[in-house]
């Protein structure tokens, strides 16, 4: 793994741990924790793409696809979390 991959993985691991800690502790998740979990997952995926043997164009397309897909999924998930009362809006 590259240094960037390791750092992205550590960031994602910490974000997931915080997400789990909040949901198990209070039954709720702060919006900033939700957003950090999403953003760290995207960064982790992008670092893995960057380290791959794809061409530069393929890497660019893959990163854009990951970004768009994860944001769409997170948007749907976040909406459900807000409707269920599990997400605490912090913005």
Q: Where in this protein do the model-derived segments appear?
A:
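Extended non-catalytic scaffold regions that mediate assembly and binding
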Residues: 1-3, 45, 59, 87-91
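N-terminal acidic leader/helix
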Residues: 2-31
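Intrinsically disordered, low-complexity regions enriched in polar/acidic and amide residues
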Residues: 4, 8-9, 57, 82, ...
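Amphipathic alpha-helical core segments of compact helical bundles
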Residues: 17-21, 25, 46, 50, ...
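A compositionally biased, intrinsically disordered/low-complexity signal enriched
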Residues: 23-29, 54, 71, 82, ...
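Charged low-complexity stretches with an acidic bias
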Residues: 62-91
């Amino acid at each position: 793994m590259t240094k960037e991959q390791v750092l992205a993985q550590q960031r994602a691991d910490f974000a997931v741990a915080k997400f789990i800690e909040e949901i198990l502790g209070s039954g709720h998740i702060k919006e900033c924790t939700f957003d950090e979990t999403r953003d760290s997952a995207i960064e982790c995926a992008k670092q893995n793409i960057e380290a791959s043997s794809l061409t530069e164009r393929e890497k660019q397309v893959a990163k854009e696809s990951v970004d768009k897909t994860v944001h769409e999924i997170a948007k749907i998930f976040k909406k459900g979390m807000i409707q269920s009362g599990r997400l605490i809006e912090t913005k």
